[in-house]
Amino acid sequence: MRAFDQGLGRSLWFVGGVDPECITSAILRFPKSRRNDLWSGIGLACTYTGGGDSGEVRELRRASGAHWPHIAQGAVFAAGARHRAGNMVSQTELGCQLLCGLSAQQAADLCEETLRDVPYVSETTEPDYEAWRRLIRAYIQLGEDLSENLPVNSGRSVQPQVAQRTVALSNRKEA
């Protein structure tokens, strides 16, 4: 159901016509337990495909409220996908800056670095994909200094101790 809701969130970006009020209204019709994944999908669609101006993206971030780490995680995934495709565009930069407070390159680096750390944190029954998403949200929430912890093309992973500390903090019940 979670992956379905992430896809549904992506579709809301298009169906809602890039209108934050329409998108928020649609999300509020769903049970609270599904909203995190919906916001994640919206963050990915907004950042990957664009279509919104800075005011609309800011309003979307504001409207996400307590779900902001999820919309930010979606933006990080979008930056990672654009980076891997060698196809960074201005809308990806805009989405990353406004939804998660990172440049598109920092977000792409975060996406790659946290993926490398999944083996250090996936000691639960949680699927690796969900551990990866959780790590991204944790880094965003902690406001790690990416210039020190995630150097561009460093070829090295974040220290396992840092990943474990981040996961310990992220294990606190998420909204």
Tell what function each PLM region has.
Residues 1-175:
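Mature, well-folded catalytic/scaffold domains that follow N-terminal targeting or propeptide regions
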